[in-house]
Amino acid sequence: MSGRDISVAIQYPGSRVNRITYPLSKTNIEYEVSADNPFDFDIVLLDCPGLNVLKPLAKAKFSSVPVVYRVQGDVLRAFQEMNYTNFKYRSAKYLFSHLDGAIPIEPVLGRRFSNVTGVRNIGTATLAKSEKYWPNAKHWDESLRLISVTNVNYIGKVQPMVDYAPYISRFLQRNGGHWNIYGKGRLAGYLQDNLGGYDNISYCGYAEDIKSRYANSNCMLHLSNFDSLPNAILEGFASNLPVITNPFSVFSDYHGPIEVTELKKIDAKLCSMQDPTTRRIKARQGQEYLKAKHTPEIVGEQYSVVFRSVLNDC
């Protein structure tokens, strides 16, 4: 079956449905968002943000059409971190087990999802990103203007920033610069309480125009113990920023050009990033990586492969 033969109904879309439609627009796949008659299509693709997926899953369980779920982050761990009841967690695993396929954005997450739910038809489709649509951050001075963008709902995303803050603050105090953190969520108060005492670190809440914040930065920090392939890292690459992460397993195994550093070695890593030439080189590597791995054509073909595999098995 060729891509031209496949039709996909994208149901229960979140605010980021363009992460699917953009790459699919570069394929021969016919698709419709929020179709009135989704079961007239070859495949129903659920695009629910993680914690909103239970009701759509329950409805899809009775479908005669193959149902595929786009796994947005580590959704099963999200259920646990948000303190959902054990009943809801077991219900989610049960409903997930009736899926015909799942599409995470990186293989490690896919293996974990398969091991927990029993879903076997797992195929990876990453995120499409191009520097054409993002600012071109400038590297001309030695003063670091650090930026982090994250989801503040999960302690696994928040705690590493709190842990690294004393080390980063001391470095900035000696060398100048500032670290701005953007994002919203239920742990905003916790983050503010723990970072409010630093003169050179600011928790800024949600940014309406994040692109302008990237344009005014010259290095990204993405410190997390709860992620698959963060969209923010790709946005950093697209915005001509070098990206520094902590040695979380997903980052350590990642083949993209991020700079992984341990807590006590953050000084040395930040020191190297003071050099504008080093930042430009690292940032250029990120943009070249996007061109090689994250074009909409590449991601669209990844979706096509998953859909063909699901249809062949049904």
Curated annotation (Swiss-Prot):
Keywords: Glycosyltransferase, Transferase
Gene Ontology MF terms in the entry: glycosyltransferase activity
E.C. number(s) listed in UniProt: 2.4.-.-
Domain of life the protein comes from: Viruses
Pfam families according to UniProt: Glyco_trans_1_4
The keyword Transferase is annotated on this UniProt entry: yes
Keyword Transferase appears in the UniProt entry: yes
SUPFAM superfamilies: UDP-Glycosyltransferase/glycogen phosphorylase (SSF53756)
Coiled coil residues, start to end: none
Similarity comment text for this entry: Belongs to the glycosyltransferase group 1 family.
Protein name as annotated: Putative glycosyltransferase ORF31
Organism: His1 virus (isolate Australia/Victoria)
Organism phylogeny: Viruses, Viruses incertae sedis, Halspiviridae, Salterprovirus, Salterprovirus His1
